[in-house]
Amino acid sequence: GVIHGLRSFVPVMLAQGDECHIVNTASVAGLLSPPGMAIYTVSKHSVVTLTECLHQDLVTRTDLVRASVLCPAYVPTGIADSERNRPAELRNAPKALTPEDVAREEALRHAVNSGRITAENVADMVFEAVRDGRFYILTHPKIKAAIETRMQDILLERDPTDTFKPKAATKG
């Protein structure tokens, strides 16, 4: 998807000599490393890194073509229910879930479904970010704390923190 798009469009954008902007869509999972989502997360990290490299390559060649990476968090798009579209013969066998797995999935589903940011809001954010010249486009500012925690884990060479772990309910 993303690689083929870049191979098709970047040469045309460079040749036309007009201002252009590429926005690749990843996910906040491309900046974090949540458990239970390895395949999805790896693909999103790849999009982020590819776009970072693309940015570096473009700035050495031209001032006219730029790139940004969109990393949305909880936007109710129906992605959590995408398994329903997979043909029966290609579906994965159900896996046994631990109570922690169930809690994590419920918390994630709740966060997505209760998201106050619509796809239309995200589109507006993208146009604003392109106008402002921002590379990373984060739809949910509160997620920056989790990103900062991950960066600190790396810099301090410590085990990764599960920033997606559901918070324990408090009595009050």
Per-region residue spans from a language model:
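SDR active-site lid
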Residues: V59-Y136
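Active-site loop immediately N-terminal to the catalytic Tyr-X3-Lys motif
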Residues: P34-I39
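Active-site-adjacent segment of SDR/Rossmann-fold oxidoreductases
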Residues: V12, Q16, L32, C53-V65
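Rossmann-fold scaffold of SDR-type NAD(P)-dependent oxidoreductases
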Residues: N24
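Active-site helix of classical SDR
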Residues: L6, S43
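Catalytic tyrosine of NAD(P)H-dependent dehydrogenase/reductases that use a Tyr as the general acid/base
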Residues: I3, Y40
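Residue(s) in the substrate-gating loop at a strand-loop-helix junction
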Residues: S27
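Non-catalytic terminal and boundary segments that flank Rossmann-like NAD(P)-dependent oxidoreductase
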Residues: I154-G172
